[in-house]
Amino acid sequence: IEENRQDITAKVIETKADIGIAWDGDADSCFFIDGTGEFVAGDFITALLAEAFLIRTPGSKVVYDVRASYAVNDIVAKYQGSALMNRVGHAFFKKRMREEDAVFGGEVTGHYYFRDFYYADNGFLPALLLLELMSKKNCTLADLLAPLREKYFISAEINTKVASMDLVNAKLDGLASQYADGHVYRIDGVSAEFPDWHFNVRASNTEPLLRLNLEATTQAVMEQKRDAILGFIRS
């Protein structure tokens, strides 16, 4: 939540730090701020850490969630690894990590999973691994992210309240029908892939809420498609 990271963002800028690191209340998830004060998307961190693991163990499996940037898939493919898409949620991730003997897994929400940590999530290992990566390359976090930010344009998660759970399901079915000319799959909510963009819309597990994540190859396409889907959800 943006208001919860205002203090660390201000401190990073004030001290001219190369990186800011924050944890949630029980420290099982980890979040990052770059040296410019910009929040770093969890799927970009997943991509960076996947690369680090695959350099050490080429051809390994990496688990990522349905909302993630193509950056993850592209980097895993670059190192001849296997990128395994999965449902959102730590219970589903831990099960899949163990079943596949995956070396690493990452969720957009800042949960990261490690084969060497019993296939479970850990909030401190991502920070240590990212600091190691920065040290080895003698660069800042913003430097590591620059190639990703130039190529992948993501919306971040956008939440929309819906009147009822029945309407949530109707909207999901409507999206699947409206975007049927793409590659549609329903691993978790509705996802659709096109040559220059893709999206996932999924329901909250606890309230009548739809969550949109979208990515495109340009900022303009991302904004256009984002607004179109939000218009449908909110109509």
Where is each model-derived feature located?
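Short, hinge-like loop/turn segments at secondary-structure boundaries
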Residues: 1-6, 39, 79-81, 102-104
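Phosphate-binding and adjacent anionic-ligand microenvironments
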Residues: 19, 55-213, 218-235
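Well-ordered alpha-helical segments embedded in enzymatic catalytic cores
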Residues: 4-7, 45, 49
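N-terminal small/polar loop signature for handling phosphorylated ligands or for N-terminal nucleophile
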Residues: 1-33
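Short, ordered loop/turn segments at secondary-structure junctions
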Residues: 25, 36, 44-45, 67, ...
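A conserved helix-loop-strand patch within extracytoplasmic ligand-binding domains
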Residues: 48-56
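Short Gly/Thr/Asp-enriched flexible loops that form oxyanion-binding sites at enzyme active sites
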Residues: 28-47, 72-73
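Short glycine/threonine-rich catalytic loop with a Thr-x-Gly-x-Asp
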Residues: 23-25, 39-44, 118-121
